[in-house]
Amino acid sequence: MIKLIGCVLIISACTQMGCAMATDKIRQMKYLKLFRRLIFETRAMVEGGMTFGEIILKLSLQKDYSDFTFLSQDTSSPDVRRRITEEIHKSKLFDNEIRQTAIDFFEKLGTTDINGQLAYISMSLAALDEQISRLSENFTSQVRLCRALGVLSGAFIAILLI
C-alpha cells in the first residue's frame, strides 16, 4: 500500500514538473509577443517625435507592460539607458537571444535621428518576427511533449521502484 501511494506521488510530482515546463513555454511566447507589441508602439511614439525619456515613461505607465520591470526606471537620471539594459540582462522573462535583442533595442533607441530610429525599430521587429515564427512552428507539439514527458517520466520512475 505504501509503495502504491509513493508511486502515485511520484507520478503526480513528475506530471506537475511537465506542466511547469509547458507553462514556461507558454509564458515565453506570451512575453515575446508582448515585447513585439511594445516595439511596435514605440515606432508610433518615435514617429510622433517623442524623446527617449517620454517613451519610457509612457510605456511604464501602461498596465499591459507591468511585467516588464525594466521600464520602471527614473527617466530623469542620465544613466537611465544603462540601468534599463542592466535590468533586462537580469530579467528572467526572455531567453538569451530575445534578451540580446531587447538590450540592443533600448541601447539604440533615442541615439540617432528619427529615420535612423525607425530603421532600427524595423530591424528589431523583423528579428522578433523571425524568433516568433521559429518558436511557433512546433509550439503546440512542444507544449504537449513537455506534459507527456512529465507523465511518462513519473510512470517510468514508479515502475522502477516497484
Positions of PLM-derived features:
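Bilayer-spanning, highly hydrophobic alpha-helical transmembrane segments
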Residues: 5-17, 136-162
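Juxtamembrane/interface alpha-helical elements of multi-pass membrane proteins
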Residues: 3-73
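Residue-level recognition of alpha-helical structural elements
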Residues: 28-31, 53, 80, 98, ...
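Membrane-interface, cytosolic juxtamembrane amphipathic helix immediately N-terminal to a transmembrane helix
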Residues: 110-151
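A short structural micro-motif
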Residues: 62-66, 78-79, 127
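Short amphipathic alpha-helical coupling elements at transmembrane boundaries
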Residues: 37-44, 104, 123-130
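Membrane-anchoring/interfacial helices and their immediately flanking loops
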Residues: 70-96, 158-161
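Short, non-transmembrane cytosolic segments of multipass membrane proteins
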Residues: 84-115
